């Protein structure tokens, strides 16, 4: 089993979980700032947005997680803020981040679709890296399996939990997001019929479908009245993505690749 603590500086423990999240954030900010001028968005505005959105998204991710496990946290109030032990729900962070983005874009007079389109692939790569934080914390895993011989030893050993090997669902989702990120990079450079909002729609459909399937493999899902919350939200994301494509096509939204770039 790998030590979840990466660096110990006296009483200060820096965990791999936090490092994975921060690494994903830094890469996401870099990629978004690099694409921003293409959509006539000032890179400094991206930094301003992150300074506001990131702490609020972390808060939203934790609040979402606590709400759906309130039976436990109502009896363990001291653990509500112990995010270093894990317990950040991606959907809570996404919902909070999207709300902050909408308000921020409106106040900065930035087209919301453009902002979402340049942010979507960055969010996806950040999610891909962030899932490795679950790996170090031994969470977000699936059902028991006989063996994991097809995986590298360090992953196999870390997925030996409570006397059994577990499906590395964190890895499946990480790779799924990485593939989605690569496809978006290709689409936004090569697909000339790509309209404003289509990248956002692709993200919603791609991530929603992958999460819906992978969530069904997990054994630690957040439940609500006997249903997996993330699977229901995944269905909503897929439906929303399809609606965005239809809406943007009907209103003949501007193409993502401008005539100057053709």
UniProtKB/Swiss-Prot annotation:
Q: What broad class of enzyme is this?
A: transferase
User: So, what pathway does this thing act in?
Assistant: Protein modification; lipoprotein biosynthesis (diacylglyceryl transfer)
Question: EC annotation?
Answer: 2.5.1.145
Membrane topology recorded in Swiss-Prot or TrEMBL: Multi-pass membrane protein
GO MF, one annotated term: phosphatidylglycerol-prolipoprotein diacylglyceryl transferase activity
Q: Which residues bind a 1,2-diacyl-sn-glycero-3-phospho-(1'-sn-glycerol)?
A: 131
Major localization class: membrane
Q: What is this protein's function per UniProt?
A: Catalyzes the transfer of the diacylglyceryl group from phosphatidylglycerol to the sulfhydryl group of the N-terminal cysteine of a prolipoprotein, the first step in the formation of mature lipoproteins.
- Family statement: Belongs to the Lgt family.
| Protein name as catalogued | Phosphatidylglycerol--prolipoprotein diacylglyceryl transferase
Q: Which organism is it from?
A: Streptococcus pneumoniae serotype 4 (strain ATCC BAA-334 / TIGR4)
The UniProt gene name for this protein comes to lgt
